[in-house]
């Protein structure tokens, strides 16, 4: 039952994010009214005059011109596009915070002369008696970030 609910929610979000309609609160003027002579194929394939889109909210018998000569009218974004932008913003904030936290430790290690290979060996030695067969990905990422920081700060001789 839970799986069915997730399928329905995902189908609803896909349908809402791929809608090709103009927003209801647009300030753009309506170009012309749609009469029964307009074929639905023109609206569905966007072959209509001046790339018009159907205005689905409010008075549904109107067409809004989305591409005007003065500037391009920005269509309301779908749910998936908004979610993607929000996740990218969260990721950027996290990476910025992560660098702020890691850089002081990187500076201390660089002052001690710790190389990239020594750091990797330290992680391997620490994991020997833990029961794991390899180095966890978090340790590998930390070592990779240290190596990238060494290259960025001009200490490439330590990034061996």
From Swiss-Prot:
Induction: Expression is induced during host plant infection. Keywords: Host cell membrane, Host membrane, Host nucleus, Membrane, Secreted, Signal, Virulence. It comes from the Eukaryota. It holds the Pfam family RXLR. The keyword Signal applies. InterPro entries: RXLR (IPR031825). GO terms for cellular component: extracellular region; host cell nucleolus; host cell plasma membrane; membrane. It is found in: Secreted; Host cell membrane; Host nucleus, Host nucleolus. The keyword Lipoprotein does not apply. Residues 1-21 form the signal peptide. A motif (RxLR-dEER) lies at residues 54-76. Effector that is involved in host plant infection. Contributes to virulence during the early infection stage, by inhibiting plant defense responses induced by both PAMP-triggered immunity (PTI) and effector-triggered immunity (ETI). Belongs to the RxLR effector family. The RxLR-dEER motif acts to carry the protein into the host cell cytoplasm through binding to cell surface phosphatidylinositol-3-phosphate. This is RxLR effector protein PexRD44. It comes from Phytophthora infestans (strain T30-4).
